[in-house]
Amino acid sequence: FTYTPLRNDLYNLDTQQEAHQFEFPYADNTFDVVVLTSVFTHMQPAEVQHYLIQIKRVLKPGGHCLSTFFIMDKNTPEILKQNKDLMQFTFEYDTYYLHDDKVKDANIAFKKIAIQSMANNAHLNIKLLNNGWWKGGDKSASLNYQDLVIFTA
């Protein structure tokens, strides 16, 4: 693990180093497993795309990446609209939604098709997508509060 303070408008305004330009400080084909919990839920699309490319680079062939997202499928906007107790993503953009348009890295939900597109662009496969209970799903059918995605190299 290497701590690197990167700029984020929610957590860290004290640096100019940007996530979309950060090169992971590891050699190619180093890791069997990469884990990101509640990271992509605070990153913009270009940053997530860059990280997925970096993850593909550092994963060994056949390696896995366990990550969490907030994923909006075709039914999610209506589910959220009907239940205001759930986290709301009301600011829609081309491939994602924001919880707060004034703090863009606060909470980000990606459209499901955007996750697939970013995986394809990074030459990763989606092995598993498990819906979290953040959008009112059945807790017993979910592995996590956030949506869980396992990518393979």
Question: Across the structure, where does each feature detected by a protein language model lie?
Answer:
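Class I (Rossmann-like) S-adenosyl-L-methionine-dependent methyltransferase catalytic domain
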Residues: F1-E23, H50, H64-A153
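A short, conserved alpha-helix within the catalytic core of class I
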Residues: T15, M43-Q54
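GHKL-family ATP-binding catalytic core of two-component histidine kinases
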Residues: P25-A27, Q44
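A short glycine-rich, Lys/Arg-flanked "PGG" loop and its adjoining helix->strand segment in the class I
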Residues: A27-D28, Q49-P61
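Local beta-strand N-terminus motif with an aromatic residue
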Residues: F31-D32
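A conserved beta-strand element that flanks and buttresses the S-adenosyl-L-methionine
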Residues: V35
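Conserved sequence/active-site signature of Rossmann-fold short-chain dehydrogenase/reductase
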Residues: V39
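Short glycine-rich, flexible loops that bind phosphorylated cofactors or substrates
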Residues: H42-M43, K74
